[in-house]
Swiss-Prot record:
Organism: Burkholderia mallei (strain ATCC 23344)
Cellular component per GO, a single term: cytosol
Family: Belongs to the YqgF nuclease family.
Coiled-coil portions: none
One Gene Ontology molecular-function label: nuclease activity
PANTHER family: POLYNUCLEOTIDYL TRANSFERASE, RIBONUCLEASE H-LIKE SUPERFAMILY PROTEIN (PTHR33317:SF4)
InterPro entries recorded: RNaseH-like_sf, YqgF, YqgF/RNaseH-like_dom, YqgF/RNaseH-like_dom_sf
Protein name as annotated: Putative pre-16S rRNA nuclease
CDD domains given in the database record: YqgF
Keyword vocabulary terms for this entry: Cytoplasm, Hydrolase, Nuclease, Ribosome biogenesis
Domain of life: Bacteria
GO BP field: rRNA 5'-end processing
Main enzyme class: hydrolase
């Protein structure tokens, strides 16, 4: 993200999948993320209507999209689909999009859900939380704010 964000900026993160899109919300001030919802990825119209409603509700300053990669870091088919989704988010909602390497985010999400005794059907939203938390944890302590 090249533009400076306000100290209390709200972020939405997405774990894009062919059937489901996990969504998480976070805040720069607290540097914490939480799983929010799972959007069923039925078709483009449904996907962007649901995402538009979330954006209207949460009024994020920026978006984060998980970038699926092979274990060796090489891109694959889902990499391109996630990139297309993120670029469409930017084009439709005019919000900056950052990319986060999401390798093993679903593994970490499943482990976290099991440890807490939470429902396994929340794994996509939890994976989005993991992605957003990785983004927040990766910000330098001196992150530039407006």
């Amino acid at each position: 993200m090249s533009a400076a964000l306000s100290r209390d900026a709200t972020l939405l993160a997405f774990d894009y999948g062919e059937k489901r899109i996990g969504v998480a919300v976070g805040n720069l001030l607290t540097r914490t993320a939480r799983a929010l919802v799972i959007v069923r990825n039925l078709n483009r119209e449904h996907r962007f209507k649901a995402v538009g409603e979330l954006i209207a509700e949460w009024k994020p300053d920026a978006l984060v999209v998980g970038l699926p990669l092979h274990p060796d870091g090489a891109p694959h088919e889902m990499t391109q689909r996630a990139m297309r989704f993120g670029n469409q988010l930017n084009g439709r909602f005019n919000l900056p999009v950052s990319w986060v390497d999401e390798r093993y985010s679903s593994v970490e999400a499943r482990a976290g859900l099991r440890a807490r005794g939470d429902a396994a059907d929340r794994v996509d939203a939890e994976a989005a939380r993991v992605i957003l938390q990785q983004y927040l944890d990766g910000l330098p302590d001196h992150h530039e704010f407006n």
